[in-house]
């Protein structure tokens, strides 16, 4: 396929048009008075959203060069969402502001490489001042405020996220699901939960709830399949003498072994239940070891020299209670010591810091949460499917922003933190590097300007008022139109969101500004069918 090449200003101007179009669609969602965007889907109903990254992902421009620019900034929004959980609109608005400011200077003759160096130095200096102004998040109230802001000022969502985080801890897992009704709900599962249910319905003890509930059980952990009863008999006999129930967690329990366990359960000889071990392959072995640490048991594995036939009571774990349904198993109050559990948690955190795979990191985070003792499920209720999707997006954003705030602290919100940090930058630069620094210092005012514009206020007046305030915590409350102490008013942002948004925006804008050529595919010319008129009929045809 043939390709076209365009150079210098022509290339950069085309990319800039694409970036501007994407930004125009995304920026209207910014702030407490931001507007909704209606998106047509190829299937189902259109969706209404105020989530910047959802808007960005839907944009596909017809002009290939413009689309290249839009796609690069789309990537900034997605990367910011992935890394910080929020700040996608901020990153998009910043990238556009930096690129458009820089483009004017480069078109006028500035050296793009020197401009980039100045931009990088300014960005580094701003982040230093931003970090210095941040505060450690402290208590349920701060968490609720961060979550409320990210959920577009929905206090109910903010309070629910704060409650969930209080119950499961900072390392706990909080998931978001759709509720069956219109009311929001919070379910907290205490203890370790994994997604494996009972291997036979005959293990059920509570027929009303269809669950197997076992009090004060022994727990046998094995990383192999159990098919023969002969290997199990020695440990079963020892368990029976204690008159306590037994839970078997193994790769699988099948054939003769499973049928005999069921018969013993039905006859009342032994209160027993069996589930498959969670995960697959090496991850299964790791999760079995997690359960062993939590319950003070030992995994029966040939790799460690243990055999099923040689298992004794000393190898079994313990817990105060276990609840099993057809899909999940919950272990409550395992007998493992807090020191052993903490050592395992620390080991998993080290793995999380060294792995480069996002998937592995996610799975390690799940294991961390299970060991830390809690899983909270926020069930989002709404009257329609469209409202449900929009609300679920907001809850996801708020949850991610809250985790970022807990991780790296908070700064004043509403775009004011960047403006205040920029006012403190005093770099001794000259030439085109100075121009690069000034580009960043002008561009970081864009989020505050956009929030003011969306709320119907004069952007220039608002920025001047915030810059001129003597109290460093003063910012603009776009919901009320007042200048307030942002910390006292609860208008706060996670430092991590501002850091990631500015870093990513500067990075992509720098790349676009130093682009000297763009290559794109030319559309294929469709060949028309040959003209068949004037041809005689074939011989012998009627």
UniProtKB/Swiss-Prot annotation:
Localisation per UniProt entry: Cytoplasm
Residues reported to bind ATP: 29-32, 50, 86-90, 414, 477-479, 493
Gene Ontology CC: one annotated term: cytoplasm
Source superkingdom: Bacteria
Chemical reaction(s) catalysed: ATP + H2O + a folded polypeptide = ADP + phosphate + an unfolded polypeptide
Keyword Cytoplasm on entry: yes
Any single Pfam family the record assigns to this protein: Cpn60_TCP1
One Gene Ontology MF term: isomerase activity
Cytoplasm is among the record's keywords: yes
Keywords from the UniProt entry: ATP-binding, Chaperone, Cytoplasm, Isomerase, Nucleotide-binding
Predominant location category: cytoplasm
Family: Belongs to the chaperonin (HSP60) family.
Biological function: Together with its co-chaperonin GroES, plays an essential role in assisting protein folding. The GroEL-GroES system forms a nano-cage that allows encapsulation of the non-native substrate proteins and provides a physical environment optimized to promote and accelerate protein folding.
Name the record gives this protein: Chaperonin GroEL
Organism the protein comes from: Sulfurimonas denitrificans (strain ATCC 33889 / DSM 1251) (Thiomicrospira denitrificans (strain ATCC 33889 / DSM 1251))
UniProt gene name: groEL
